[in-house]
Amino acid sequence: ETALAVSLDVCSQDSIKNAVKEAYDKFGTIDVLVNNAGYGYRSAVEEGEIEAVQTLYQTNLFGPIELIKAVLPKMREQKSGYILNVTSIAAARSAVGSGYYASSKAALELLTNGLMKELAPLGIKAMVVQPGAFRTRFYDGESLQGTKAQIGDYEAVVGKSRPGNFENKHQQAGDPDKAGKVIVDVVHNDDLPEILTLGKAAVTAVKSTLEAKIAELDKWAEVSASCDYDEGE
């Protein structure tokens, strides 16, 4: 009586609408939406197959948007609810071969950043969940795909990132069960972070990335400021 399994294809608007309706018919409400569907795509930018990239974005970005839009009317009516969008450490720091995947996750993060400000006055909360490397099936089967249009000039740089070339599968430090518990615990806390980064290595990576960005801003601050009108103009 407390669980309901439904079929949901985030690339299908009809599937999304039907799944949400089934949940409402069963429980009367949806208090928490977790957008966790997604997969990886490894490719140098030039190698990217546009249809594959469009499907990636449909799964990682547009599908979650459709789900958000499907649950918000009821959440607005009840003046409560939580929307958790799962992204990736890649959204903070893209790697070679991950530009398309990272950009889809970064787009979801920035969308959530705006969404949380729009929903706060309505009593609804939104948060980004940004996991690092976790011991899941991400590197197995269809969870990680790669371009079929490989270009030899990129092999030395991108080759190691291609599906099938990973040496540390199922040795990641992140424990998915612990991550799930942390997410549940945080949702029960009124003081939600904008971004909940998961994993010690992920926190270190984000800090390093932010420090590098600050250093770059400082280095180029004078050049950046030179574009402003002179005082009095």
Give the predicted meaning of each segment.
Residues 88:
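Residue(s) in the substrate-gating loop at a strand-loop-helix junction
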Residues 68-69, 113:
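A short, exposed helix-loop element centered on a Lys and neighboring polar residues
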Residues 121-193:
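SDR active-site lid
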Residues 1, 22-33, 41:
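A glycine-rich helix->loop->beta "capping" turn
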Residues 44-45, 49-54:
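Substrate-binding pocket helix/loop in short-chain dehydrogenase/reductase
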Residues 8-18, 50:
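The beta1-alpha1 cofactor-binding region of Rossmann-like NAD(H)/NADP(H)-dependent oxidoreductases
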Residues 68, 104-107:
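Active-site helix of classical SDR
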